[in-house]
Amino acid sequence: MVMGVVVAVVVVIIGIRTSHGSRADAPDCAVVKCVALTFDDGPGPYTDRLLEILKANDARSTFFMIGNKVAANPAGAKRVADAGMEIGSHTWEHPNMVAIPADDVAAQFAKANDAIVAATGRTPTLYRPAGGLSNDLVRQTAAHYGLAEILWDVIPFDWYNDANTAATRYMLMTQIKPGSVVLFHDTYSSTVDLVYQFIPVLKANGYHLVTVSELLGHRTPGSSYGSRENGPPANQLHDIPAEEIPSLPHTPSPKPMPNFPITDIPGANSGGPNNGA
């Protein structure tokens, strides 16, 4: 009887761990082509539509959420988690983490973790610093909270090219390779539109869309990663015929949400509401 209980507990623990960032049937990214699309600064007004697009394409992604936005919209964060996506921390207020006092660095991690756990029941294991700005102190503090640092190797500047998605698309076409971690923001309707039309290109090129944890495996807390370095050979993406690119549906504009990412710590703003990460 005791053995049965132990086995049951182990199964439950493994199930929780698997559902957190990776699937039991996740592809082997050392063998097949994988890419991790990541989305910063949510949850926001376009997150739900993005979630439906990902689910319809059997795609998994990692969402680096700002803690105070999660606290303001816990139901939105839970919907992302319940859909099988991975949620990482983007700190509590999106400050420049290298410009704030050590105590504030710890608070940024602690408060964001608490908000994510309260909303989703899951403790994040990954974080992304605002603007990619980090140092040894930030990473050491992150380690205390069980967090590994995830950066990127493809940054298509979707916030800068909000009105010029052709430029964003060109960067994706020329930069993505097996093992890439792509930085997007789900706070822009243009980004969601682009993802909707670009996923068919990735799938036509044989890519599996996975979470960061599925791409990289377990990462040591306090360590830093930008992409996966071992995998299939890199080949440039081939475009698909225009008629195979799905037309954008008419979607009503969602109600605006307050923009939280600017920190209230004096002199510690990372560069604006959406400064690139």
Model-derived features: positions:
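Structural recognition of the beta-strand scaffold that forms the well-ordered cores
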Residues: 35-39, 61-65, 86-91, 125-129, ...
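Active-site beta->alpha N-cap acidic-glycine motif
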Residues: 20-120, 201, 217
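C-terminal domain-boundary segment and adjacent tail
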Residues: 26-29, 57, 70-71, 190-267, ...
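Short low-complexity, flexible loop/linker segments enriched in glycine and/or proline
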Residues: 77-79, 103-105, 165-167, 224-228
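Active-site beta-loop-alpha junctions enriched in small/polar residues
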Residues: 42, 66-68, 92, 130-132, ...
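Alpha-helical scaffold elements lining the catalytic groove of polysaccharide deacetylases
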Residues: 93-123, 131-178, 191-194
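Aromatic/hydrophobic pocket-lining residues that form π-stacking "cages" and hydrophobic walls in ligand
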Residues: 50, 138, 198
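Hydrophobic membrane-insertion alpha-helices, especially the h-region
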Residues: 1-15
